[in-house]
From Swiss-Prot:
Leader peptide range in chain numbering: none
SUPFAM superfamilies noted in UniProt: Sigma3 and sigma4 domains of RNA polymerase sigma factors (SSF88659)
Originating organism: Fusobacterium nucleatum subsp. nucleatum (strain ATCC 25586 / DSM 15643 / BCRC 10681 / CIP 101130 / JCM 8532 / KCTC 2640 / LMG 13131 / VPI 4355)
InterPro entries membership: RNA_pol_sigma_r3/r4-like, UPF0122, UPF0122_fam_protein, WH-like_DNA-bd_sf
Pfam families for this protein: UPF0122
The family this protein is said to belong to: Belongs to the UPF0122 family.
Cystine residue pairs: none
Protein name: UPF0122 protein FN1394
Lineage: Bacteria, Fusobacteriati, Fusobacteriota, Fusobacteriia, Fusobacteriales
Function: Might take part in the signal recognition particle (SRP) pathway. This is inferred from the conservation of its genetic proximity to ftsY/ffh. May be a regulatory protein.
Length: 103
């Protein structure tokens, strides 16, 4: 898994974690936020590494499914980009344009 994908999943987890089961949330947080390996998570939870892998895989698929439907992460990225652009060139016209784009 490349770093960009890892960061994206961590961001999706931040937004959508409340929609996951407690175990999926726990396993995903351990893996993506606490940087634990699958083996470490399996040992801590007295389950097989394969069970952790399957749960994480399903959890990640759910996160992407929620994002495809709700697009909260994309909206967050768009707002951030617009604010960075505004910071670089602040004018009343640019502010109005950005507000219009965000609405």
């Amino acid at each position: 898994m490349i770093l960009d994908e890892f960061v994206e999943i961590a961001n999706l987890l931040e937004i959508y974690s409340s929609l996951l089961s407690e175990k999926q949330k726990e396993y995903l947080e351990d893996h993506f936020e606490n940087d634990l390996s699958l083996s470490e998570i399996a040992k801590n939870n007295n389950v097989s590494r394969q069970a952790i892998y399957d749960n994480i895989k399903r959890g990640v698929a759910l996160l992407y499914d929620y994002e495809d439907k709700l697009k909260f992460y994309q909206m967050k990225k768009n707002i951030r980009k617009e604010l960075v652009d505004l910071k670089e060139d602040f004018t009343k016209e640019n502010l109005e344009k950005i507000i219009e784009n965000l609405l």
